[in-house]
Design a protein with these regions (language model features):
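Terminal amphipathic alpha-helical/low-complexity segments used for targeting or macromolecular assembly
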Residues: 1-99, 227-228, 233-259
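Structural signal for interior beta-strand "rungs" in well-ordered beta-sheet cores
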Residues: 95, 100-239
Length: 259
């Protein structure tokens, strides 16, 4: 059996009521194999199919099984004792791969992958299922959520939030493609895709619910920013302004994209 088929079988059992208390030792061994494959980049929570990003549902099922079929235990991290169903990623090999993590607060959970020549500044957090590509900067106060796919040579500005998407399992995670620069304070959520080579201004919110006014192709987009764009926040008229409670009109955020 393949790892995929084994995880799918475990997911079926979990959906039928299997609990951490009932799980056999081989369940934990399977979950450990699964987490190790994620960390090695052998499997990923999403991949491109015919040029479009799609979730690997079975990988997200495996992550949910990890949470549901392992007992909470105490773990030590420096002088801190914390309680979780898994430990943190082993970082002994980071230096030999050219990856740096500064002290006092760079946290990478099991099941996440860090590429080579990555820089993680304190404090920052990378969650399970996330994939951070080679040469990427994760700056101070950044969060890379569960299953997020971050490309190579990406710059995540300080205080940037990359949202996690675990459920529904069919839902594609947030994707930031290669050579993207996100300014400080940006937030990318709910499966939004930031196209390769784009530069996004500080404090921009990218989410499928906010329209992207692409001035290059003169179209309004939802859920993705095309490659090689310069994007920033502006405000446009909102129909809410027609309500009597809003004297002088009302405005809603929008993203404007140019070359």
């Amino acid at each position: 059996m393949t790892l995929e088929s084994e995880i799918e079988g475990l997911w079926e059992r979990y959906q039928e009521g299997l609990t951490a208390a009932d799980a056999e030792p081989q369940v934990d061994r399977l979950i450990e194999e699964f987490l190790t494959a994620l960390e090695a980049g052998e499997i990923r929570a999403a991949e491109t199919v015919d040029g479009e990003w799609e979730a690997n549902a079975w990988v997200k099922q495996g992550i949910l099984c990890t949470f549901g079929l392992r007992e909470i235990t105490a773990h030590e991290y420096g002088d801190v004792t914390y309680n979780d169903v898994m430990g943190l990623l082993e970082t002994d090999d980071l230096g030999e791969r050219g990856t740096r993590n500064t002290p006092n607060g760079t946290v990478v959970r099991r099941g996440a992958r860090l590429g080579s020549d990555v820089i993680m500044m304190s404090p920052s957090f990378v969650n399970i299922g996330a994939n951070v590509g080679d040469g990427t900067l994760v700056d101070s106060c950044d969060t890379v959520g569960s299953c997020a796919q971050i490309g190579e040579n990406v710059k995540l500005g300080a205080n940037t939030l990359i949202g996690g998407v675990l459920e529904p399992v069919e839902g594609a995670p947030v994707v930031v493609e290669d050579d993207v620069s996100l300014g400080a304070g940006c937030r990318v959520t709910s499966g939004f895709v930031v196209g390769e080579g784009s530069v996004v201004g500080e404090n921009t919110l990218l989410t499928p619910r906010i329209p992207v006014y692409d001035l290059v192709e003169e179209e309004i987009l939802y859920g993705h920013l095309p490659p090689e764009r310069r994007a920033f926040t502006r405000y446009v008229d909102s129909s809410v302004g027609d309500h009597d409670l809003f004297e002088g009109g009302a405005y809603k955020p929008a993203v404007v994209a140019t070359h």
